[in-house]
């Protein structure tokens, strides 16, 4: 009956910019200047998790952070009407190992039912995934 307590952290820094200027009739791009940030890419992303593992079961609590990003190309601070604000979402997962071939799984996404935005295109603001739960059977041979 040995327990493990793994902890993980991850960070991603994504610094984007267009290296050429161009114009597009597509509404998603418009006129691009050299040095404009590419839309819909968060500069900062972070995730962390802590788990409790045993020979028969696993429990994991994880959190993920996505930084603010712009929805149109541009430089400097992001105007509110072209911004999707940062968000943090917490998830929970579990697994019970029935035998060496079968496990029962359970997952809760967005444990605290956080309301957050993920997009503005097309047709306005779009929410992220609300609270959801699932159960399943995993087979391994």
Give residue spans per PLM region.
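Gram-negative outer-membrane beta-barrel transporters
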Residues: 1-73
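C-terminal beta-signal and adjacent terminal beta-strands/loops
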Residues: 65-74, 95-141
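Residues that define the transmembrane beta-barrel architecture of outer-membrane proteins
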Residues: 3, 42-46, 86-90, 129-133
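Residue-level marker for the onset of beta-strands and adjacent loop->beta junctions
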Residues: 19, 46-47, 90-92, 102
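Extracellular loop and loop/strand-boundary signature of outer-membrane beta-barrel proteins
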Residues: 28-37, 76-81, 120-125
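Short, glycine/charged-rich beta-strand-loop motifs at protein surfaces that mediate ligand recognition
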Residues: 77-84, 91-95, 102
């Amino acid at each position: 009956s040995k327990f493990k307590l793994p902890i993980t952290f991850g960070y991603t820094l994504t610094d984007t910019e267009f290296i050429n200027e161009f114009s597009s009739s597509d509404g998603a791009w418009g006129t691009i200047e050299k040095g404009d940030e590419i839309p819909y890419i968060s500069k900062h992303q972070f995730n962390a998790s802590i788990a409790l593992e045993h020979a028969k079961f696993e429990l994991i609590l994880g959190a993920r952070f996505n930084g603010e990003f712009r929805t149109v190309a541009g430089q400097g601070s992001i105007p509110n009407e072209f911004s999707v604000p940062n968000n943090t979402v917490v998830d929970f997962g579990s697994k019970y190992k029935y035998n060496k071939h079968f496990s029962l799984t359970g997952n809760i996404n967005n444990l605290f039912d956080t309301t957050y935005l993920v997009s503005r295109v097309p047709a306005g603001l779009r929410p992220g995934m609300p609270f959801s739960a699932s159960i399943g059977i995993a087979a391994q041979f």
